[in-house]
Amino acid sequence: MQVNVLEYLDAGAARRCPDRVAVVDDGRSYTFHELQRYARQCAALLVRRRDVANQPVAVFLPKCAAAIIADLGIVYSGNFYTNLDVKSPPQRIRNILSTIRPALVVASRDLAPALHAIGVEVERVVFVEDALVESVTYDGDSLSRRLRDRLDVDPLCIINTSGSTGTPKGVTLSHRGTIDFMDWAFSALDLDGSERIGSLSPFYFDIFTLELNLCLAKGATIVIVPDRLASFPLKLIEFVAEQEISFVFWVPSIMVNISNQGLLERFALPALKKVLFAGEVFPMRHLNRWRRAIPGATFINLYGPIEITVDCTYFVLDREFGDDDPLPIGIPCRNTEILILSEDNRLCGVGEHGELCVRGTSLALGYWNDPEKTAKVFVQNPLHSSYADLVYRTGDTAFRNERGEIMFVGRKDSQIKHLGYRIELSEIEHQILRIEGIANGCVVYNSTRKEITLFYETEGHDVAPAVIRQALSEVLPKYMWPTMFYAVAELPRNPNGKVDRQALLARALETDRA
């Protein structure tokens, strides 16, 4: 039985096709043999710097082949990785590091000043450039022994997601959950290793987990899409065509932008065979444009919070949908059960809305260093008390249609999906209330326009939106900034004295953008 994801590489692509290209990064190609060797060299450097096992190691690198090598090197060393967003404000990075307390940090030399500025001692940093030279030696038997000491229930990585207190939560994924998900994906999605993956999502996003392990196990090629192309649909679609990309796993926002600009009619994409999407609702009228433009491709809608290891349901588009029809999130992945529970914890019937809960081996290990938050959402299955049986309460509302397909409705609370990112609106509010001159604030999400909208009270003098944006730029990534701002004399309240979020949401939906 497979215990560690590195068995995908060691017994898979590196053994079967060592000279095949594993990663393409801005014109530079790396074979599977090179990927394996550099990763082992990185592991050797990590162990020499600090001989620990089953500890978190942070990766502070932009999206590049070196980051993949660092991730694999960390796992070879018997530890687990967490990829950081180098573009995040320094305070957010500090918050993550203070929660995770990594044993070491892997970075590049050009990022050393940034690490120093946030308080990371140079003694804790291993520079990835040092692993990419021929002179590094390593003891293969020693690394193998380190891996043998690890169990499949040990952590593989930590993915940092928005937290309600202003500090991101570290979702801890295991080897077993990842292996279970990938074994399902290989079979259900008919993945055979011929794929050229157009890797667009950041490596600190959970989509990378599928891309990486498809590469390692089957010999698929990861073609890293340069970050600079993400905001330019024309350049992005040109890249997909020129690189003969055959597999993408993108958030719908990117695909909607391409559709909106009429680019699907201008570019033939005969190589594109698998189109996966997740993270937010894909408007059917835009999805239909994609299906008409690439009739030979298979389109698959996936759903799942990070806490269940990438995704837990899927829907292969196997029939026609009208432009206004809702799109199912489908059926559970293998070895996963979806429970839709009512407020009184009974199973909902067909058409009845309830909270979507997940059970199975793909559940995360919890939130790193936060047992209290973990216990709130990873709970005993409320349908019985006969044995320990954890379920994850997603906070999403869903129902089953007459076909037995699961239909997503929305969030139960203030957590949203925006541009593919999961965001706690309360984290934004937490930072808003720290801005001088703001007395109170409430953030709502206009899902129709995909706008984060801020309503706020001031302390007697105007606080311009530009001032708010500047303050938020120091603590939050850009995708979490409000895009609409409304200063109000007083926030509306409901009978129990709380801010009436529904009234504000209604106002946001009714307000003319002009």
Regions found by a protein language model. Name each.
Residues 1-158, 173, 180, 283, ...:
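AMP-binding/adenylate-forming domain of the ANL superfamily
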Residues 10-11, 65-85, 185-186, 206-220, ...:
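Hydrophobic alpha-helical segments in the ANL/AMP-binding
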Residues 61-64, 85, 191, 201-205, ...:
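Conserved AMP-binding
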Residues 169-196, 206-246:
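Conserved AMP-binding/adenylation subdomain of ANL enzymes
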